[in-house]
Amino acid sequence: MLFRSGTLPTDGATGEAEWTGFVPFDQLPHLYDPPSHMIVTANNRPSGAPGAPLIGMDFPTPYRAQRITDLLTTTAAAHKLTPDDFARIQADTVSLHARSLLPRLLAHVQPTAQMDREAVDLLRAWDDDARADSAAAAIFEAWFLRLAPSLAGDQL
């Protein structure tokens, strides 16, 4: 049988594309009382053993889950977590993606036009906080969306 990932339409008229069963519960990704005593997810790809059943194709990058883990770890080291801590962590908008990638991108930029120089100046001064009113965050995201296809080339 041809493997169907679900990323393309299939012919629903014949019944050949129907589900043939479910992944057994014990094969689904799971954690029980991990050493860190916390389980964090931000819709990122669950880690699984090689050969684990396919449970999805499109997952966000792990940056958000990593940021949540970092904030939980540092906050819990300082004091017992409170509902206010969880609210602050939930509302956090710092972009680890930008923090990781932006210094490397800026190292290779030599803007010539005034508007480009202003954009680069905003990015260099940015605190990596992707607040809704952040011009630098908007510039970074637009830049990355234009840049990503050229970095990945035919792999996309």
Language-model regions, residue ranges each:
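Long, compositionally biased non-active-site segments enriched in small/hydrophobic residues and glycine
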Residues: M1-L156
